[in-house]
Design a protein with these regions (language model features):
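A polyanion-binding, active-site-adjacent surface
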Residues: 1-174
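N-terminal accessory regions of nucleic-acid-interacting proteins
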Residues: 168-203
């Protein structure tokens, strides 16, 4: 993990690539370079952010090697942990992530991958949960805002403004620790006067 003590934001990826290990630093290469630029456009700098992965050791190439995503992939080696069948080493990795968060106490943790999102919240799919204000189930009280992996932006450039939007929310939310959820209330089947009143407010 790299980044300053007392950082308000921690970004957590899934699995390091070869370039990360060669440089000894997370989020290196094209995706990492783009992440640095997007952070700056969102109002912060790479040097102000903690960065790490769930997986912190060499030898693992993908999430599928660690987590049985389909029933047919489950073997005798897998253990049930946080609702997923995983290799035993994943349990250790997630506990190490928990310890790192408890030690550093960032205001917001940003998972940028499905494994990271699951480790922090028990949910899967950053595409479904991106930009959501969530509370960690791994570290209760910890604020979590997922976004897409940097490599997803390289592959699909149209995702770039979306990730920057998410990171801007991260920067805003990093100003306070409380998880301030919006209390949405909906008016279902309003009568005519109520509908006219609401429409007048929109004009």
């Amino acid at each position: 993990m790299i980044g300053p003590k007392g950082a308000r934001v921690m970004i957590v990826g899934d699995v390091p690539n070869d370039a990360d290990f060669q440089k000894g630093e997370p989020f290196i290469g094209g995706g990492g370079y783009e992440l640095s630029k997007m952070l700056q456009e969102a109002g912060t700098f790479r040097e102000e952010v903690l960065m790490r992965y769930v997986v912190m050791e060499e030898g693992w190439g993908s999430v599928e090697e660690l987590v049985a995503l389909k029933k047919k992939d489950v073997t005798g080696e897998h253990v049930l942990y946080r609702g997923k069948h995983v290799l035993p080493c994943v349990v250790e990795m997630v506990e190490e992530l928990k310890a790192a968060i408890e030690e550093e106490r960032p205001t917001v943790v940003v998972p940028v991958g499905n494994l990271a999102l699951w480790a922090l919240t028990g949910e899967w799919s950053v595409r479904n949960w991106r930009s959501s204000l969530m509370e960690s189930t791994l570290v209760p009280g910890q604020k979590v805002i997922p976004t897409l992996p940097p490599l997803a932006v390289i592959v699909q450039w149209g995702m770039r403004p979306i990730v920057i939007h998410d990171l801007k929310r991260v920067v805003r939310e990093s100003q306070w620790r409380e998880i301030k959820r919006v209390d949405y209330s909906f008016v279902i089947r309003p009568d005519y006067p109520t509908a006219i009143e609401y429409l007048a407010k929109l004009i």
